[in-house]
Amino acid sequence: MVNVPKTRRTYCKGKACKKHTPHKVTQYKKGKDSIFAQGKRRYDRKQSGYGGQTKPVFHKKAKTTKKVVLRLECSVCKYKMQMTLKRCKHFELGGDKKTKGAAISF
């Protein structure tokens, strides 16, 4: 379980700052694929009509986890940057901090 705080003081590369400032942390999410991308247009054209599936469907998935990508936004100049973490099964943003000697509860 990886628990990351919602704010983090780190270096800002923005033109206004160029110093350590508090950043707001969110988890990166992939945007919706455009239907106008060249590959998608070509694929849709090829798929239309009779003939079934025209390109191979990928089945040999090797990874069980994805790398977690954090999106950091400077609270001073609103400059945004991304930062990758290691692979993990469980990721939590701004969860409760662990205390020493506390019983584990699920």
From Swiss-Prot:
The annotated region (Disordered) lies at 36-56
The organism's place on the tree of life at top rank? Eukaryota
- Look up keyword Ribonucleoprotein and say if it applies: yes
Q: Which Gene3D superfamilies does the record match to this protein?
A: 3.10.450.80
PANTHER family per the UniProt record, alphabetical = 60S RIBOSOMAL PROTEIN L36A/L44
Other remarks on this protein? Confers resistance to cycloheximide, an inhibitor of polypeptide elongation.
* Name of the protein in question: Large ribosomal subunit protein eL42
Species the sequence originates in: Phaffia rhodozyma (Yeast)
